[in-house]
Amino acid sequence: KASVIVDVYRHKTPTHAFGIYSQERLSDANFLDIGAQGYVEKNVLNFLTGSYYVKLNSFNTGAEDEEILLNFAKKVSENLGEKGRLPFILSSFPEEGKKKNSEKFINKNFLGYSFLHSAFTADYELSGTKFKLFVIESDRKECKDMIQKYLQQTKSLEKNIAEGRYTISDPYHGEIFLHWKGKYIWGILNVSDISLRSKYLKLFE
C-alpha cells in the first residue's frame, strides 16, 4: 500500500527554520524550486518555506515516487502561505571557491562557545585548500562583548577593543582570523596562507 508521511516543523523565525534545514541537507542533493528551497532523494523530499521546515517520506510509491512527493509538497507549500527566501546574509559570502549549498546556520554556541551566539558558515575549497568562512550578526555592543570574551577565553593580550582585524590562537580550532565592523563579525578557519586569508576577509567587506 502506497503512502506519504508529511511532517511540518514550525520555527521561531525563517532563519531558525533554515538552521535545521541546512544541517540536514546534502550539498550535492537534487535541488528543487519549491518554497525557499527544497531537494528530493529516493523516498524523501524536504523543503523550506517561511518559518516552516517540511519533510516528506514516501513508501511503496514505485517509479512515480518523485512525482508523487512533488505533488504533495506543492500542496503543502501552497497551504503554508508565503514561501519567503533563504536568509539575505548568505549573499555576503564571497562566491569564489564556495561549495554550493554548503551554507549553514548554527543557532547557538558557535565553535563551542556560549558567548559567540549564532553564526552563518560556508565551506570553501581553492587550489586544494579547504577552509570555512563565517559571519556573526548582532548589535555593535554585543559584537564588542563577543570579541572581548573571546580574547579573554584564549588569553590573548588586547587592551583596547576596537573595530578591525584580530588573530586569535584558539586551543581547539587553531588560529582564527576575524574582522569586526559595526554589527558584524566575520572570519576564516583552517587557513595558514596569509594572502589567502587577507583576501577573503577583505572580500567580505
Task: Outline where the language-model segments fall.
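Soluble, non-membrane globular domain cores that form compact, hydrophobic packing
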Residues: K1-E205
